[in-house]
């Protein structure tokens, strides 16, 4: 990058974690929980300088005295005041930059309501005085990060999953399917099935422990019934986990029963199709001529696709649904937890992208609706 060029900022706001950094980098500089906490009680100590709100890791560490709120639900911003706090924290505390000096690329969920994109645009230009900004769809960025412009992305994070077919860089809105089943639901389900084993996890603090157990020990079985039999007849699948207080717990079939929910949502009482069927349904909503390209370029993205065994299982399940001669390829990049951010970093540093930014001047002339004309 030339010295006179200012690095663009790339901010990927997820339901669970916010990923932020500089365009051209290969990984985000800052990754922190998308939470805002407010004190539950009036401060007693004089001169403690208690703040009226905490964001991210600080909110997480003080969660005992705070009420925690997630401003992004199912991938979509629902609380703008808190969202503004998260962005403020991102710029000033995490990245330590002056937002008025850097163009910023934000990400949005597929099928994000129009009013939401306008609000994001308005806050960037009016509250943070950004010189330029752009809003890109998360799944499209994941596809770019894998070096493709055509394919179908299964993006599964903490709050929502989507299957997004993309042709020549454009998402096909009529074929996008949203599935309200993601990481947080899997954590809740693991809490429930661990309770059946006699371990009690109930508070929000304990939920974080269960999330860690899920991330470290869960995996997807290639054949669920077979795996259940193996687990019942031997202890080969059992693993132990040490809790923060030193107590050690043992976990067996829960390891693969937890992520099996992605393929069988009925486990948590949801009447929806699993991720394999949703991906297939999404492909079937597309023009018959491009289906072959989608089957051969099925890209996994997001933290909830990090389970070992998930790609093989997807390959098996989609092969069973697709026409018998169809070539099916599941792409699971090792860095897929951050592939949305990485795609944003790639896009914002392309020389051809520089004329795509919405400038402050364009915003002042046209208002927030400019976002629909320039970002699609």
Curated annotation (Swiss-Prot):
Q: Which PROSITE patterns match?
A: ACTINS_1, ACTINS_2, ACTINS_ACT_LIKE
- The entry's keywords: ATP-binding, Cytoplasm, Cytoskeleton, Hydrolase, Nucleotide-binding
Q: Which reaction does it catalyse?
A: ATP + H2O = ADP + phosphate + H(+)
What the entry lists under CDD domains is as follows: ASKHA_NBD_actin
Q: Known InterPro entries for this protein?
A: Actin (IPR004000), Actin/actin-like_CS (IPR020902), Actin_CS (IPR004001), ATPase_NBD (IPR043129)
The enzyme's main class, written as a single word, is hydrolase
Gene Ontology MF annotations: ATP binding; hydrolase activity
Q: Name one GO cellular component term.
A: cytoplasm
Location within or outside the cell: Cytoplasm, Cytoskeleton
Q: What is its EC number?
A: 3.6.4.-
Family listed: Belongs to the actin family.
* PANTHER family in the cross-refs: ACTIN
User: Its function?
Assistant: Actins are highly conserved proteins that are involved in various types of cell motility and are ubiquitously expressed in all eukaryotic cells.
| Name of the molecule in the record | Actin, non-muscle 6.2
Lineage of this protein's species? Eukaryota, Metazoa, Cnidaria, Hydrozoa, Hydroidolina
């Amino acid at each position: 990058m030339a010295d006179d060029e200012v690095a663009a900022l790339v901010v990927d706001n997820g339901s669970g974690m916010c990923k932020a950094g500089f365009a051209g980098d290969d990984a985000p500089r800052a990754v922190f929980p998308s939470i805002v906490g407010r004190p539950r009680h009036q401060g007693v100590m004089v001169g403690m300088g208690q703040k009226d709100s905490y964001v991210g890791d600080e909110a997480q560490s003080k969660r005992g005295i705070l009420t925690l709120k997630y401003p992004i639900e199912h991938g979509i911003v629902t609380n703008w005041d808190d969202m503004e706090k998260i962005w403020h924290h991102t710029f000033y505390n995490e990245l330590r930059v002056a937002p008025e000096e850097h163009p910023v690329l934000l990400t949005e969920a597929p099928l994000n309501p129009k009013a939401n994109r306008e609000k994001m645009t308005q806050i960037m230009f009016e509250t943070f005085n950004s010189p330029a900004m752009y809003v890109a769809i998360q799944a499209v960025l994941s596809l770019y990060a894998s070096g493709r412009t055509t394919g179908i992305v299964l993006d599964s994070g903490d709050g929502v999953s989507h299957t997004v077919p993309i042709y020549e860089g454009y998402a096909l809105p009529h074929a996008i399917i949203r599935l309200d089943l993601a990481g947080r639901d899997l954590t809740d389900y693991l809490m429930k099935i661990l309770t059946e084993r006699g371990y009690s996890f109930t508070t929000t603090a304990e939920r974080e422990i269960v999330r860690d157990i899920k991330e470290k020990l869960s995996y997807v079985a290639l054949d669920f019934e077979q795996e259940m039999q193996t687990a019942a007849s031997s202890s080969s699948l059992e693993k132990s986990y040490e809790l923060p207080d030193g107590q050690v717990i043992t976990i067996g079939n829960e390891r693969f029963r937890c992520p099996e929910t992605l393929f069988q949502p009925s486990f948590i009482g949801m009447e929806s199709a699993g991720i394999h069927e949703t991906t297939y349904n999404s492909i079937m909503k597309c023009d018959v001529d491009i289906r072959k390209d989608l089957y051969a370029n099925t890209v996994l993205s997001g933290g909830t696709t990090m389970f070992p065994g998930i790609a093989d299982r997807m390959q098996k399940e989609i092969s069973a649904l697709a026409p018998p001669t169809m070539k099916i390829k599941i792409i699971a990049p090792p860095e897929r937890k951050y592939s949305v951010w990485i795609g944003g970093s790639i896009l914002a540093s392309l020389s051809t992208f520089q004329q795509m930014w919405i400038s402050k001047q364009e915003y002042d002339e046209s208002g927030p609706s400019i976002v629909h004309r320039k970002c699609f």
